[in-house]
Curated annotation (Swiss-Prot):
Cofactor note: Can also use magnesium, calcium and iron ions with lower efficiency.
UniProt GO MF annotations: transferase activity
Organism expressing this protein natively: Streptomyces hygroscopicus
GO biological process: antibiotic biosynthetic process
Domain Pyruvate carboxyltransferase: 39-313
Residue intervals passing through the bilayer: none
E.C. designation(s): 2.3.3.18
Catalyzed reaction equations: 3-(hydrohydroxyphosphoryl)pyruvate + acetyl-CoA + H2O = phosphinomethylmalate + CoA + H(+)
Name the UniProt record assigns to this protein: 2-phosphinomethylmalate synthase
Length: 440
């Protein structure tokens, strides 16, 4: 037999450390040379999250901003938060964030506005120093918003707004809406004109460009053609000599590739990802920034400071309180993200905790591994729950466990299909254990 048993198990600790998220291990010489030196995130919950149906009162908006600041801490992971400036409640939330930022909060508030002179005037009065400018770039938009003027009229309007922003000392972020259905020729021409316009302004006002996968149809592959290839769009913009921090990706999740597209963009040299924590947003949502963070941490970004991902749980609680919580099976922070229902998996957890743990979830996310007691969880699932709840080391064959399991089996035999909650099981356990073991 050619299979030989090693003296010690191989757990690949350099890839799966017990105190960090899984790491990206590059073979020698294979780390992508286009990876940016630094990557950071732009949070758009106050804009796209709200636009997608998140019900934000002024108080809720303030609390979200504060939680986002708690998540990023001094890591610089999240540097921008994007706001609407139009309604009173949105302006008041924006002003609150601006005041907090001036007092030292780590996230700089920016805005999303239409490429109109009056909108630029509005944010100048508020005191914003960077803004996104809606610059629809596909013919699906230009030919139907500007009629016969099409691309020419659209470009003229965008450039006028860019110039006005620069004149007011506001850094423009050109949002190339619907990039993944846009003509590369038009995008090249528009970017070239924007950069030419900005030449006479100082470095801190040089524009950023947001690649918008507005309908989530972008692909993370560089061997497919434009306009759908996200890496090729990033490469096109890098070709203008733009730094990674001048290029931003804003993807949607309509075809399930939102995180893959973020990672593909970063690999190609994009330095900023726009999304929302917990993935809220228009239609199927934006890039879930906590997921992007996990991958970037695995690549070694922000290694000098702690990203406080367990603080995302505060956002989960807040959203649940306004009826907009994540689904139970939402990765990382859903109620059931680390809950198994299969007895064979529960048996693995009992034997070796790491067998069915992708990483140290309690440490890194503040979420416990658990087992739901169902008809499929069996004795192994019950053992896991009892040992966790009672602080014991019970084993299979314990008659007290058998008594509780028999009660559960009667539930399934009677046609029950829902999980058994601890509140139901506790009196059964107390009776079986006669309370002297300290059931609690």
């Amino acid at each position: 037999m050619t299979v030989q048993n090693p003296q010690e198990p191989e757990y690949f600790p350099e890839v799966f450390p017990q105190d960090a998220f899984p790491q990206y291990a590059w073979d020698e010489g294979m780390r992508p040379i286009t990876l940016p030196h630094e990557v950071w995130l732009s949070e758009t919950t106050h804009r796209d999250g709200q636009q997608g149906g998140l019900p934000l009162s002024l108080d809720t908006s303030r609390r979200i901003y504060d939680i986002l600041c708690e998540i990023t801490g001094d890591s610089t992971a999240i540097r921008h938060a994007e706001f609407f400036p139009y309604r009173d409640s949105d302006r008041n939330a924006l002003i609150y964030a601006l005041e907090r930022h001036r007092d030292g909060a780590p996230i700089e508030p920016t805005t999303w506005i239409r490429a109109r002179r009056e909108d630029v005037e509005l944010i100048k009065r508020i005191g914003v120093i960077e803004t996104g400018l809606l610059s629809s770039s596909s013919d699906y938009h230009t030919f139907h918003k500007f009629g016969s003027g099409g691309r020419t009229q659209a470009a003229s309007m965008y450039l006028d707004a860019v110039t006005m922003a620069l004149d007011h000392g506001i850094r423009p972020r050109v949002h190339l809406e619907d990039t993944t259905r846009s003509s590369p020729d038009f995008v090249r021409a528009l970017v070239e004109e924007v950069l030419k316009t900005a030449e006479r302004y100082p470095a801190e006002l040089q524009p950023r460009f947001r690649v918008c996968d507005t309908l989530g149809i972008g692909l993370p592959y560089d061997d497919v053609s434009l306009p759908r290839s996200i890496p090729r769009w990033i490469r096109l913009l890098r070709g203008f000599g733009l730094s990674p921090s001048q290029i931003e990706l804003h993807p949607h999740n309509d075809t399930w590739l939102v995180v893959a597209n973020c990672l593909a963009a970063i690999r190609e040299g994009c330095g900023v990802i726009s999304g929302t924590t917990l993935g809220t947003g228009e239609r199927t949502g934006n890039a879930p920034l906590e997921a992007v963070m996990v991958h970037l941490l695995g690549m070694g970004y922000w290694s000098g400071a702690r990203v406080n991902l367990p603080a995302v749980n505060k956002l989960v609680e807040l959203y649940e309180g306004i009826g907009a919580g994540p689904s139970q099976k939402y990765p990382f922070f859903g109620r059931d993200a680390y809950v198994t229902r299969a007895g064979i998996h529960a048996d693995g957890l009992n034997k070796f905790w790491w067998m069915y743990a992708p990483f140290n979830a309690p440490l890194l996310t503040g979420r416990e591994l658990d087992v739901a007691l169902t008809k499929d969880s069996g004795q192994a699932g019950l053992l896991f729950v009892l040992n966790k709840r009672l602080g014991l080391q019970l084993e299979k064959g314990d008659p007290r466990v058998a008594e509780v399991l028999a009660w559960m089996d009667r539930q399934w035999d009677a046609g029950r299909v829902s999980a058994v909650e601890w509140s139901e099981l506790e009196p059964v356990v107390e009776k079986a254990f006669a309370t002297e073991e300290g059931v609690g």
